[in-house]
Amino acid sequence: MSSIQLDGTHTPVKRGGQAVAYQGRKKSKPRNMLILTDSRGTPLACSDPVEGNHNDAFDLVPTVEKMIGRIQSSGIATDGLFLNADAGFDVKDFRDYCYQQEIVDNIDQNRRNGDVEEHFFDELLYKYRFVVERTNAWLDAFKAVLVRFETNAVHIGKH
């Protein structure tokens, strides 16, 4: 395995419960999760669900640290991996974490950050990131049936 993809998914929750909060942009109460996949879109690790009023970069380093720990505990080496993520993950603390873990970050630059230092960015490798979008679409369709009516946040990752 040479690259992993990171993205977040936001699922509307109809019956309330844990880890739910109003998101004005979605005009609903979603629940957010981050997902790490391999280059074929197979999920490697998911974050714990968080309230939907947070963006993907909320509490990013501790969240990804747990996810990387789960991957490493299953015997998969993460040093030297390329990590693709969209501009929403262009956060200095997260780039520093990737550097410390010997993970090469291939994150699109967030234009809202202003003029910042140049980072390595491989557009050809970045195209692999879209497999995580396909995985998110599948998970959203599945969760549309299951999670929308699940009120207990503990049960979300158990299915």
For each of these PLM feature ranges, what is it?
Residues 7, 121-122:
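Poly-acidic low-complexity segments
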Residues 101, 122-159:
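Basic, amphipathic alpha-helical segments enriched in Lys/Arg and hydrophobic/aromatic residues
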Residues 114-120:
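Short, charged, surface-exposed secondary-structure boundary motifs
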Residues 88-90, 111-113, 137, 144-145:
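Short Gly/Pro-enriched loop/turn and capping motifs at secondary-structure junctions
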Residues 1-111:
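Polybasic low-complexity intrinsically disordered regions
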